[in-house]
């Protein structure tokens, strides 16, 4: 994010070099970066001050009873705990197929949700996406400048997709199939509807991702023309079409809305049914890969590799996925976009030795998980290209157990204390916080 500021005329004794030093120090102090323009009677000079290194914290949570400042009484203590994290960003997963299952009816923005987590209590109903946006707006009013909305779209309604073709793994459902031409037009209308709904509820949805994990067959299929690593990659073109439709919808809407590219699953090498992150970036058209200066990458924390078969996370499993991120940074540079990419880690978390696998919850294991996540956050803080890390999720999803509090809302894990400590630093450029006592 760059904010232009006009500079007043400077005294003759104050050199341009002096301005550069002062401005760089100011940028480092406030944890921001700016595009600075100095007016002249002859010309306009533009100075870009690079962003300082640092790390902001985002959070993924869908339950409006937890996300807002009001809601069901049973959720109140945990709602307060989420609010105390004060994340810079909140990531909302918007599942198109659930909101508009039929082409003959408009999206049901208020479709009642149980508030359970995959049928597990505690439960309390809320009004679907409308309720989520209302809750987000409450937090944005209570915490100005924080809880900024980031939308991640996925889940194609079967009526909007192409027939099965190419390499589609047997377990992949119809909501993962690529969109047809008519489906792409409907997708743009759907995005426009979400934008309109957010305006009516007063929620700031600043950042937008066209599709979740587009290099993963459970979200876009086919990934390849046939199930072999040397087969033609198809998913980059499917994703590019989505990005262009999203660009059109955002450009037509009032307000400040920004595109985020990627949301890629952390596949470090090509697989027969999935593209590696590097392979996916290489396959994108130039206009798409250069359409934003932010690339979103998933990187969970674990201790074991995942083997040769594509799974939901796909992570190499090492803290911070340092090798994968280095490869990502190199391929993004190689694509030659005018503006260097910033990297957002839009899904992370820690649980078992294998990301997404069974999570030990004995005290020693939980402390070890906390220290492992802290190592990843510290590595990303030190990486000058990484700006943000999003915890997935607040309330633990038992199908992917890396949350900050348990599914039944009876206990907070040590990682809650850690994420809160990172998030509540004065500025994202402040150094890593002390490791909480619960993690030691």
Locations of the language-model features?
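N-terminal Sec-pathway targeting helices
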Residues: 7-25
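Structural preference for beta-strand elements that scaffold enzyme active sites
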Residues: 54-58, 89-91, 146-150, 205-209, ...
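Short, acidic/polar
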Residues: 67-83, 187-197, 273-285, 370-379
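Substrate-binding cleft and catalytic face of glycoside hydrolase catalytic domains
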Residues: 85-269, 302, 350-353, 395, ...
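Noncatalytic carbohydrate-binding groove/subsite architecture in carbohydrate-active enzymes
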Residues: 141, 184-197, 201-206, 230-366, ...
